[in-house]
Amino acid sequence: MASLGDLVRAWHLGAQAVDRGDWARALHLFSGVPAPPARLCFNAGCVHLLAGDPEAALRAFDQAVTKDTCMAVGFFQRGVANFQLARFQEALSDFWLALEQLRGHAAIDYTQLGLRFKLQAWEVLHNVASAQCQLGLWTEAASSLREAMSKWPEGSLNGLDSALDQVQRRGSLPPRQVPRGEVFRPHRWHLKHLEPVDFLGKAKVVASAIPDDQGWGVRPQQPQGPGANHDARSLIMDSPRAGTHQGPLDAETEVGADRCTSTAYQEQRPQVEQVGKQAPLSPGLPAMGGPGPGPCEDPAGAGGAGAGGSEPLVTVTVQCAFTVALRARRGADLSSLRALLGQALPHQAQLGQLSYLAPGEDGHWVPIPEEESLQRAWQDAAACPRGLQLQCRGAGGRPVLYQVVAQHSYSAQGPEDLGFRQGDTVDVLCEVDQAWLEGHCDGRIGIFPKCFVVPAGPRMSGAPGRLPRSQQGDQP
């Protein structure tokens, strides 16, 4: 399968070849992509029609509607190809299928998907009448044109009036089609990212192979002897992939009343900048490899989260770049939890959006935009044996602007798209333009049309921008 960069590059060059009228070059680019998406198959079909090869166009449109069974404009153009091949019964069937995919709407605007064309219901009915004329169904053709006139914009009936007059005189009607030279084009947002990007950067040493190294935070695995302390305070497993982020979990730290254990997995590991001297300890987080607090010692949390020896401490598990189990007072406020989390993960604590795991077997993550949501989370956690579980999410360090709910299902047309089902909640990471958003859903990141979603509720604090009011109730 071609990479996203190769796909977008071939797509863009093919569209430029269409603009120049170089049909052979355009077909080579559109058809040369392995397993092309539906929009590229549609482009190839349109170019075959322009080149005067309706048979090849029919095969290309067959692939397009097979890959995307809801592509109304694909059935529309396939009907045109069948019409040019004098297969009028097949053309009539395709035009009816195109009208069915309009789902009662007056038009479908394909501009936001890259095609500068709006498929109108009256145009489809006009082509239905054209095929019926070729089949000798004059009464049905006149009825189809009258229905098309009812869907035509007010005050602009002259074109269909002349067509109806021609049908009543039993004259043929040429079919309408997508304007010459119009094809699906890649979004300009993708064209800006065709150049390679170094996501990993330079490697950093996070674990020393020297046993006597005094660097803090990460140490090589220590030998275990018969007299070694079985309550070892540190265990680090070296990994050649240290310093890169490959998964949602890479280390877990548990701070209890009588022990402190830290484990770094081979998948992922936080980076350590300081080497050569001991760093001052943050309150509430014991040094890795050092002695933990005794049975009567309570780690002090920032902002009062761990203060107050008279109140019992509970474990709060937080998932960020890695999982951290912190000790905090039950019912601690939002600022106290963020301050306590900031001692271990300053960057995520500032940019990430906190969510809590709802109770139940099919529990989902519920955002915590304000203090009231956190207190509700504490109430739910009181009846849950696993305690309060939080998630500090920001999709690779990127903050979540706000959340939207899918009003309609959206099928990804290519690897750059984010598909989802009706009712799914999507985290919005970027407002690409007036018609497109970039979002995160079920561990995947991609772009999707704004008209498929509606706001999920109040915006998260500090999130810029607004979902346009005109898009909130649209349907595709």
UniProtKB/Swiss-Prot annotation:
The gene coding this protein: NOXA1
All residue ranges annotated as the PB1 domain in the record: 315-395
Protein name per the record: NADPH oxidase activator 1
Keyword Glycosyltransferase: no
Bias-annotated ranges (Low complexity): 279-288
Keywords per UniProt: Cell membrane, Cytoplasm, Membrane, Phosphoprotein, Repeat, SH3 domain, TPR repeat
Compartment list: Cytoplasm; Cell membrane
Any one GO biological process: regulation of hydrogen peroxide metabolic process
GO cellular component: cytosol; NADPH oxidase complex
Post-translational note: Interaction with YWHAZ depends on phosphorylation by PKA.
Residue numbers carrying Phosphoserine: 172, 461
Region (Disordered): 259-308
Gene3D superfamilies from the UniProt entry: Phosphatidylinositol 3-kinase Catalytic Subunit, Chain A, domain 1 (3.10.20.90), SH3 Domains (2.30.30.40), Tetratricopeptide repeat domain (1.25.40.10)
Consequence of changing residue 103 to E: Loss of function and loss of interaction with RAC1. Loss of localization to membranes
